[in-house]
Amino acid sequence: LFLIMFVSIIIFSFTGWGGFLERLALRVLLIPIVSGITYELIRWLGKSDNILSKVIAYPGLKLQELTTKEPDDAQLEVAIAALMTAEGIKPDEKTIGELLEIGAKNLKEKDIDTYVLDSQLLLGMVLGKDRIYLITNRDKEVSHKDEKEYMALIEKRSKKMPIKYILGETEFMGFDFDVEEGVLIPRGDTEILVEEILSIIDEDKELDVCDLCSGSGAIGISLALNRKNIKVDEIDIFDIPEKVTKSNIVKHALENRVKFIKSDLLEEPIKLGKKYDIIVSNPPYIKACEINNLMDDVKLYEPHTALDGGEDGLIFYRKIVEESKLTLNK
């Protein structure tokens, strides 16, 4: 097509004389010549591999590529939607039950042990409903917009992103806490640490407590929620833990009793001359050589700064012991 246009322009440029009918008749008569020249050019281009032939063929090849290129998924979706709209066809919407089955199947194939629970939590997040609603309304249809959002979340979870990061929250000591990538997700095992400290704090005792390497602030905030007369300093050195901890302090309305201090371990409290009755911490304790052996959910997404405890896993414990001598009340 490009060559025909090219040859036609060149030949017809010499036929500008005479009236309109004369020019029209002459151009019709020249069509066989245009076709013949174009045919010979095509044959020559097919056999030649020099720069001139490539230059002449380039526009035509690009035009061919543009007109014959297969559409991507997004273009296909638009085309199908336009066709269905033109035909007055309304696409079927899947039900809650169908989407739960699809999501669970996808997660199970990726070896996600909690595939049923996770599929329910993710669909509930999209719809703003709890699990009981999903279970009792399995036949209710879900909009295509919500279905697309749900499947995007399923895709994230299938890549082993922790469900807590996707949901943006977790439960610890019976309380809800905001979490996001960049802070360690509080573990159920850590509740033992909180319970042990609560056991040695009287209900009405006024104490100053330090939650060191605070992460999400879950430990210190849980202590403050269970003991109304204590004050807590949440300490971490990184920006995301600072943001998340402050968010959780506000979430639980503890601004008057819980504060955040950005510090490398106890460096700032020492400078400020602060003293604490209790220092609690769940610092990084995994040996550096063992990080790559952790589950994908952990090693691919959770911050290594909250996991890596150095060569023997005890580097932070030694520092905390030494610095605590300068900040603990005797």
List each model region and its residues.
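Conserved AdoMet
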Residues: M125-S199
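Polar-ligand-bearing catalytic/cofactor-coordination segments
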Residues: L1, I42-P91
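Conserved SAM/SAH cofactor-binding pocket of Class I
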Residues: D189-N293
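Mobile active-site "lid"/loop adjacent to the S-adenosyl-L-methionine
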Residues: Y285-I315
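Conserved Class I SAM-dependent methyltransferase catalytic core
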Residues: E311-K330
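Juxtamembrane "helix exit" motif at the C-terminal ends of alpha-helical transmembrane segments
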Residues: I4-V28, S35, Y39
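A short N-terminal interaction module
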Residues: E93-Y150
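Residue-level signal for inorganic ion chemistry
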Residues: L122, K160, T190, I219, ...
